[in-house]
Amino acid sequence: MITLWGRNNSTNVKKVLLTLEELELPYEQILAGREFGINHDADFLAMNPNGLVPLLRDDESDLILWESNAIVRYLAAQYGQKRLWIDSPARRAEAEKWMDWANQTLSNAHRGILMGLVRTPPEERDQAAIDASCKECDALFALLDAELAKVKWFSGDEFGVGDIAIAPFIYNLFNVGLTWTPRPNLQRWYQQLTERPAVRKVVMIPVS
C-alpha cells in the first residue's frame, strides 16, 4: 500500500497526487501540513526530519521518501513503465529538466502571488511585491510558450513528468483572477491539460 501525507491545496502535494492518479495506483492519503498539523509530530519527523509535505511511504518496496520531484521520479520509474517512464535517458532528461526548472524558477514567482495575493488579507497585501511577481511570471510564461511552439507537451510527444511538475503552478496562476498576456501555445497546453481526468480530480480545485 502507498500512503501519502499532505494537504490537497499544496502545489507540491498535487504533483504526487497527479502522478498517483495518472498511474491509477491505489493509495491512502493522510491530510497533513498547515491547518492539519501532523507534520511536526515525532512520528512524522522520524520519517521526514524536514517536517514538510509531501511524504510518501510505499510498503511494497519498503521505501519512505520526501521531496515532491523525487517522489514523482520514483513513482514513474517503479510503476510508470510504458506510461510516465521514458526509456531513453536523453528524452527522459529533456522532460525531467522541467521538474527542476519548475521548483527552482517558476515556484518562486508563483509563491509571490499565492502568498501575497491569495493567502494575505487585502488590507495587508504588498501590491508592489505582487506586481513584481506578476511581471516575473509573465516573462516565464513567454519562455514556456516558446518551448510549446516546438513540442506538444513539456515531456515531448506524450504527457509526462515535466508536465506534472508544471501543471499545479500554471493552474493556480491562471485561476486567481489575474489577466495575463495571451500566450497561444501555453493556452493550448493548458486546455489539453484540463481534459485529463486526473488533472480535473486533484489539480483543478479552488486555489487557497
From Swiss-Prot:
Binding-site list for glutathione: N12, N39, V53, E67, S68
EC number: 2.5.1.18
Broadest EC class assigned to this enzyme: transferase
Any coiled-coil regions, as ranges: none
Domain GST N-terminal: 1-83
Keywords for the protein's UniProt record, in alphabetical order: Transferase
Disrupted gene: phenotype observed: Mutants are hypersensitive to bromoacetate.
An example Gene Ontology molecular-function term: identical protein binding
Residue ranges of every copy of the GST C-terminal domain listed in the record: 88-208
InterPro entries tied to this protein: Glutathione-S-Trfase_C-like, Glutathione-S-Trfase_C_sf, Glutathione_S-Trfase_N, GST_C, Thioredoxin-like_sf
Single GO cellular component term: cytosol
PANTHER family: DISULFIDE-BOND OXIDOREDUCTASE YFCG, GLUTATHIONE S-TRANSFERASE-RELATED
Family that this chain belongs to: Belongs to the GST superfamily.
The protein, known as: Glutathione S-transferase GstB
Gene: gstB
